[in-house]
Amino acid sequence: MKLKTIGVTVCLLLCSLVSLAQVWQYVDPRIGSEGVGRTFPGPSMPFGMCKPGPDCTVKPNAGWAPMPEVVTGFSQTHVSGTGGGQKYGNILIQPILWSEECGVRSEMTQTRLNEDFSLGYYATTFENGIRTEITASERCAFYRIHYPHSSLYTPHSSNSLLIDATHYLGKNPLPDLREQQQFVGAEVEVVNDHEVRGFSRVRGGWNNGDAYTVYFCLMSDKAFIQKGANTFVFNDTLLNIKVGISYVSTQQAKRNIPDCDFDTQLNKVRETWEQQLCKFQIKGTEKDKRMFYTALYHTLIMPVDKSGENPKWRETPYYDDYYAIWDTYRSSSPLITLLDEKREAEIVNSLLNIYKREGYMPDARSGDCNGRTQGGSNAEVVIADAFVKGVGRGARSEECGVRIDYDYALEAMLKDAEVDPGADHEKHGRGGLNEYLTYGYIPYGIDRAGTRTIEYAYNDYCIAEVAKGLGRTDVYERYLKQSENWKNLWRADYEWDDVKGYIMPRDAEGRWLDSVPWGKSKVFHPQIPYTPVTKVAPWYLPWWSTFFYEALSAEYSLSIPHDVPGLIAACGGEETFRKRLDMFFERKRYNVGNEPSFLTPCLYHWIGRPDLTSDRVRQIISDNYTDQPDGLPGNDDSGAMSSWLAFHMLGLYPNAGQSYYLLHAPLIPEWTLKLCNGNTLKGVLKGKGTHFEKVTFNGQELKDARIEHADLMQGGELAFYVSAARKAKAGEAFPRWEQSIPTLGINEEP
């Protein structure tokens, strides 16, 4: 008997150790859910289409909010980390205690007493004793609802479930408000005493999209009796229901319901996430692990895999909810490439399928409709990033099992760069393209002229990269030259805040503008001085109508990722550039909460000071990121803020659209990554202190603190050396290769 007890104890201990080794347990869905992060805290599969969770009011983009404590119900579709107008929040269900005296809807809105969050799981207990647990598959929500034992069915009261197909986020009594969703139609049909099906059709939302339809099929393990049009009563205290969703039909929604129970699906969602997250193994504090693995998790929630669920065409793969590429191309897409190269290849092919069917690739897309473009046509950066890293090319396409037709991709990129979308410029393409091609910049007065000019130049550089690799020398030379157009808005003699040279507004006649109109009043025409920290619009005009989008000239003037050597020269050389960077950070011009400044801390690399990059990054993370619910400094934007954090915790950061990573001292003392080709990459911090000295790869010092993606994919060890005292100078200046174009031979595979 004692031996049997010992055996059981050892078995339980081993199971406990295995459980502790699972990294999914470090994911905290609450991180970023409060404050400005706006992350979705409910259950989701990687890139999952179904994201069920509570809608506390119709205002939060992710549905959930810490306050007020009421819950309107649980809807099946949400986005994560987004700003602007709401999207989705379709097919709401709400467990209620129905009574003949009070009526059905009197207790529709419930008050939360407590909540439980973990990866793949959400639960809450209402004030009336109802407890709801939720998990999800890719296209189906699972609910386990516990009613109080004292509330069994009587002729006058019952345990009930309300289904509201008219619900959506962003409801507003005023019709046709910009960025607001509007109801189009809905239907609820009772098939039998275990099955309900129907649809919800809504239009608008953040991207001002066409109407989309969410079909559903609800299956219950207990028979119900219908009470009214959309309320169903049960003579039981435990109810298991599944809500399959589809964008094609109710029949497809039913087929999307897995044949398993709640606990089985909960284990499956966690196993699926574990397969993705455990590719990284890290050593560090518990806080480090929570922050890092949650950042990876946020990066893999969107875009959404809707392959086979597009009502407009059948080509696969198909991904939706690019929300938005302007946010995600800098760090989210490169991180997905490292974690799941096959997935990134599918995402690129999805962009090309959208181009094939709709004429343009999106810069943003939701509800099966392109829109809204924010700055450039940044699908070009995503494609170039995949191209220079060999994704879907040659032997690498065989390794990941997906091939990308880059000749066709170049065609799609050139469509963006050469064909003005006209009135559809907020949906896709390049607004102001004719002016850009005529003047070499976009004149003031056209929305987001400064942002568009800078980003179009960057996009042109990405076109040049792909064209060179494909042997299209004529296209390469033209777009390489065009990538210098940022210089046409560089006002070299403008001095402000002890710094000379800024990206500044210019009119169609080529005149620099020292003052600009304030607002768009047709009666008054006030002018205000324009400076590098001026937001050229009053409160009632959004970022869409300003010279720069979501940042100011002081920030955008350092955002030339494809030509940092040219930027340094324009600023007056390396020493002047360093002083400018120092003042930029010390005077609080840097804004980690918006994407245009993502690369800025790494600009010290180009003047041979990766140690200063390391210092800035460490301070930025310390000041702005935590493992708390308000632990993100800005809208997570489909994993943008989170992927920025994850990369820097590892000690590397991509320059999107280019083939290398910039290296600095990691925050994690040791990590390993299982690469998609089977090789293993290891990072280890050596020495004591915080001052970055040097980095080696497989024992060889990397003089410029940078590593090529192709070298990284061979696997090996990155050793980051730190010390307590700073050296006079760390590393060396970046080599001045030709415009940073990768040295690909004609049609040469990387």
Task: Tell me the role of every PLM-derived stretch.
Residues 686-699:
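Surface-exposed interfaces of beta-sheet-rich extracellular modules
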Residues 1-10:
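Bacterial N-terminal signal peptides that target proteins for export
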